[in-house]
Amino acid sequence: MRALVIDDSRTMRRIIVGVLRSLGFDTLEAADGREALDVLESGVQVDLACIDWNMPVMNGLEFVLAARANREWRDVTLMMVTTESEHGQIVRALAAGAHEYLIKPFTADAIREKLQLLGLVEWEVSA
């Protein structure tokens, strides 16, 4: 599986990439929504996009709307990973087409659990 991490913070991208790689994902990075659309437009297959909300050029909500408007990208799972914690913002993102919403700061376990709920990571069965 391949994930696209979209965040204007290089440090945050590294953190999320590290978690995703530990879960078996190949990763790509983009610093804003426009750069992320360029990745998708290049034809690279992406299974998951982890999206920050507050970015220059094109913010996360604009990216979600653009991704959902293109039939070729409808199978990409979109997960917001952002500091935006107001209920209205969460509702807007989910209504726009995001599948899941994770508020920063987060733990690696929180990302894993969200991906398990989305069916992208297998549930661990304890013996």
Protein language model features and the residues they cover:
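Short hydrophobic/Thr-rich beta-strand motif most characteristic of the beta2 strand and flanking loop
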Residues: 24-31, 39
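Short, glycine/charged-rich "phosphate-handling" switch motifs in NTP-dependent
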Residues: 99
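Active-site beta3 strand of CheY-like receiver
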Residues: 44-50
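C-terminal output helix
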Residues: 106-115
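Charged docking surfaces used in two-component/phosphorelay signaling
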Residues: 14-22
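Receiver (REC) domain active-site loop signature in two-component systems and cognate sites
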Residues: 55
